[in-house]
A protein has these predicted regions:
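Extended, low-polarity transmembrane helix blocks
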Residues: 1-35, 50-62, 66, 72-140
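Perimembrane loop-to-helix junctions flanking transmembrane segments
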Residues: 38-52
Length: 140
């Protein structure tokens, strides 16, 4: 399979988005500059957790930072799938709040996009690149 410039552009767009997005959101779990993240935690989760919502959000932040960095720095395929599952878990939490359905839908769609990133990465890992009319096979 040959990789076109268009497919490569889609891959890099998704990789940067799913690298920087979780990284920024993860860092913000410690500052709450973008939003107070605890408000998105369902009452059921708050009562079930053995730690405070603040501490839980700090753990979430660390996980998101790891996911973002892993996607940016080479473990894109595996962490694309992890991002998909993570986003769907966030959506399930949001739905269980009885509010924030719009954000839940967004996260479901972002999860599908993370799946696309993982699949495009798999395709790229076994392809021939074409640059200036020359074919180059990716090293195995």
């Amino acid at each position: 399979m040959l990789v076109s410039k268009e497919l490569n552009a889609a891959y890099w767009s998704l990789r940067v988005a799913f690298g920087l997005g979780p990284l920024i959101a993860g860092l913000d779990k410690f500052t709450n500059i973008l939003v107070n993240w605890e408000k998105y935690l369902s009452p059921m989760a708050q009562h079930t957790l053995p730690i405070s919502p603040t501490n839980f959000m700090h753990i979430v932040g660390v996980v998101e930072i790891i996911v973002g960095l892993a996607i940016l720095f080479g473990a894109t395929r595996v962490f694309g799938y992890i991002a998909m599952i993570w986003l769907w878990c966030i959506a399930a939490n949001l739905i269980s709040t009885g509010t924030y359905y719009d954000i839940a839908v967004r996260d479901i769609l972002l999860g599908l996009s993370a799946y696309a990133l993982a699949r495009v990465t798999e395709a790229r890992e076994s392809v021939v690149f074409v640059e200036h009319g020359e074919e180059y096979r990716r090293a195995a």
